[in-house]
C-alpha cells in the first residue's frame, strides 16, 4: 500500500535521479516502425488509427494548418498511450503532473497564437474586440479577451490533470475499501469490487476521451489562427 493517498503521484526516482524522462519516452516503444511489420496487424491498426485522427482533426484546417498534422497525430497518440499505461498497477502517470501538461499546452498554444499573428494579424487582433461593441465597453472587453486568451493553455493543462488524477484517486479509494471489507463483510467487498471493475472500464474510456479533448482543443486553437 502507498504511504498516503497522493504517494502514487510523486515522481519516481532511481538512485536519487528522477526517471520521468524514461517513463515519458516509454510509449514510443509501443509503436514500432520496422519494415518487417508492413503487413502486420498492429501496423494496419496504426495506419487506420492515424487516418481516423487526421479525418477527425485536420479536415477543417487550411493547407497551412495541415502542416501541423504530424504534431497533432503524435500528440493524441502520446497522451492516449500514456494515460492507458498509467492505469496499470504500480505505474506512474506523467499526465497527472500539472508541470508535464503545461509543458505540452503552453508551446502548442503559443505556436498557434504566433502563427496567427504572423499570417493573420488583423483577424487575430479582431478577436479581442467583437463587432458592434459599444465604445464604453471596448477597454473592458479587450482586457477580458486578453485574459481569456492567456488562460487557454492553463485550462488545457488543468483539465487533463484534474480528470486523470480524480479517476486514479477514486480507484485508489475504492480499491482500499475493497481490501478492508474483505475481512469485515465479504458481500459488501464483492459489491465494491464490481464497482471497481466498472470504474476501471470507465477510466479506460476517460483516458482516451481526455487525449481526444486535449488534442481537439489544440486543433481548434490552431484553426482559429490559420
From Swiss-Prot:
<feature type="transmembrane region" description="Helical">
    <location>
        <begin position="6"/>
        <end position="26"/>
    </location>
</feature>
<feature type="transmembrane region" description="Helical">
    <location>
        <begin position="164"/>
        <end position="184"/>
    </location>
</feature>
<comment type="function">
    <text>Subunit a, of the mitochondrial membrane ATP synthase complex (F(1)F(0) ATP synthase or Complex V) that produces ATP from ADP in the presence of a proton gradient across the membrane which is generated by electron transport complexes of the respiratory chain. ATP synthase complex consist of a soluble F(1) head domain - the catalytic core - and a membrane F(1) domain - the membrane proton channel. These two domains are linked by a central stalk rotating inside the F(1) region and a stationary peripheral stalk.</text>
</comment>
<keyword id="KW-0496">Mitochondrion</keyword>
<dbReference type="GO" id="GO:0055093">
    <property type="term" value="P:response to hyperoxia"/>
</dbReference>
<dbReference type="GO" id="GO:0005743">
    <property type="term" value="C:mitochondrial inner membrane"/>
</dbReference>
<keyword id="KW-0813">Transport</keyword>
<feature type="transmembrane region" description="Helical">
    <location>
        <begin position="189"/>
        <end position="209"/>
    </location>
</feature>
<dbReference type="GO" id="GO:0046933">
    <property type="term" value="F:proton-transporting ATP synthase activity, rotational mechanism"/>
</dbReference>
<comment type="similarity">
    <text>Belongs to the ATPase A chain family.</text>
</comment>
<keyword id="KW-0472">Membrane</keyword>
<dbReference type="GO" id="GO:0005739">
    <property type="term" value="C:mitochondrion"/>
</dbReference>
<feature type="transmembrane region" description="Helical">
    <location>
        <begin position="138"/>
        <end position="158"/>
    </location>
</feature>
<dbReference type="GO" id="GO:0015986">
    <property type="term" value="P:proton motive force-driven ATP synthesis"/>
</dbReference>
<keyword id="KW-0999">Mitochondrion inner membrane</keyword>
<protein>
    <recommendedName>
        <fullName>ATP synthase F(0) complex subunit a</fullName>
    </recommendedName>
</protein>
<feature type="transmembrane region" description="Helical">
    <location>
        <begin position="97"/>
        <end position="117"/>
    </location>
</feature>
<comment type="subunit">
    <text>Component of the ATP synthase complex composed at least of ATP5F1A/subunit alpha, ATP5F1B/subunit beta, ATP5MC1/subunit c (homooctomer), MT-ATP6/subunit a, MT-ATP8/subunit 8, ATP5ME/subunit e, ATP5MF/subunit f, ATP5MG/subunit g, ATP5MK/subunit k, ATP5MJ/subunit j, ATP5F1C/subunit gamma, ATP5F1D/subunit delta, ATP5F1E/subunit epsilon, ATP5PF/subunit F6, ATP5PB/subunit b, ATP5PD/subunit d, ATP5PO/subunit OSCP.</text>
</comment>
<dbReference type="InterPro" id="IPR035908">
    <property type="entry name" value="F0_ATP_A_sf"/>
</dbReference>
<keyword id="KW-1133">Transmembrane helix</keyword>
<keyword id="KW-0406">Ion transport</keyword>
<keyword id="KW-0138">CF(0)</keyword>
<dbReference type="GO" id="GO:1902600">
    <property type="term" value="P:proton transmembrane transport"/>
</dbReference>
<dbReference type="InterPro" id="IPR000568">
    <property type="entry name" value="ATP_synth_F0_asu"/>
</dbReference>
<dbReference type="InterPro" id="IPR023011">
    <property type="entry name" value="ATP_synth_F0_asu_AS"/>
</dbReference>
<keyword id="KW-0066">ATP synthesis</keyword>
<keyword id="KW-0812">Transmembrane</keyword>
<dbReference type="GO" id="GO:0045259">
    <property type="term" value="C:proton-transporting ATP synthase complex"/>
</dbReference>
<dbReference type="GO" id="GO:0015252">
    <property type="term" value="F:proton channel activity"/>
</dbReference>
<dbReference type="InterPro" id="IPR045083">
    <property type="entry name" value="ATP_synth_F0_asu_bact/mt"/>
</dbReference>
<dbReference type="GO" id="GO:0042776">
    <property type="term" value="P:proton motive force-driven mitochondrial ATP synthesis"/>
</dbReference>
<dbReference type="Pfam" id="PF00119">
    <property type="entry name" value="ATP-synt_A"/>
</dbReference>
<feature type="transmembrane region" description="Helical">
    <location>
        <begin position="68"/>
        <end position="88"/>
    </location>
</feature>
<keyword id="KW-0375">Hydrogen ion transport</keyword>
Amino acid at each position: 500500500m502507498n504511504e498516503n493517498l497522493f504517494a502514487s503521484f510523486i515522481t519516481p526516482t532511481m538512485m536519487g535521479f528522477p526517471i520521468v524522462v524514461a517513463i515519458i519516452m516509454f510509449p514510443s516503444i509501443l509503436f514500432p516502425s520496422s519494415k518487417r511489420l508492413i503487413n502486420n496487424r498492429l501496423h494496419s491498426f496504426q495506419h487506420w488509427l492515424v487516418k481516423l485522427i487526421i479525418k477527425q482533426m485536420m479536415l477543417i484546417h487550411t493547407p497551412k494548418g495541415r502542416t501541423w498534422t504530424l504534431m497533432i497525430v503524435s500528440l493524441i497518440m502520446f497522451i492516449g498511450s500514456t494515460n492507458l499505461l498509467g492505469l496499470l498497477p504500480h505505474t506512474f502517470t506523467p499526465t497527472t503532473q500539472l508541470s508535464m501538461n503545461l509543458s505540452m499546452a503552453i508551446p502548442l498554444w503559443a505556436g498557434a497564437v504566433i502563427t496567427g499573428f504572423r499570417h493573420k494579424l488583423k483577424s487575430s487582433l479582431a478577436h479581442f474586440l467583437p463587432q458592434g461593441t459599444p465604445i464604453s465597453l471596448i477597454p473592458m472587453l479587450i482586457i477580458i479577451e486578453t485574459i481569456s486568451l492567456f488562460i487557454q493553455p492553463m485550462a488545457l493543462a488543468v483539465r487533463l490533470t484534474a480528470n486523470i488524477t480524480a479517476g486514479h484517486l477514486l480507484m485508489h479509494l475504492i480499491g482500499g475499501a475493497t481490501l478492508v471489507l474483505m475481512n469485515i463483510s465479504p458481500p459488501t467487498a464483492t459489491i465494491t469490487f464490481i464497482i471497481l471493475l466498472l470504474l476501471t472500464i470507465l477510466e479506460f474510456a476517460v483516458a482516451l476521451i481526455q487525449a481526444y479533448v486535449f488534442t481537439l482543443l489544440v486543433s481548434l486553437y490552431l484553426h482559429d489562427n490559420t
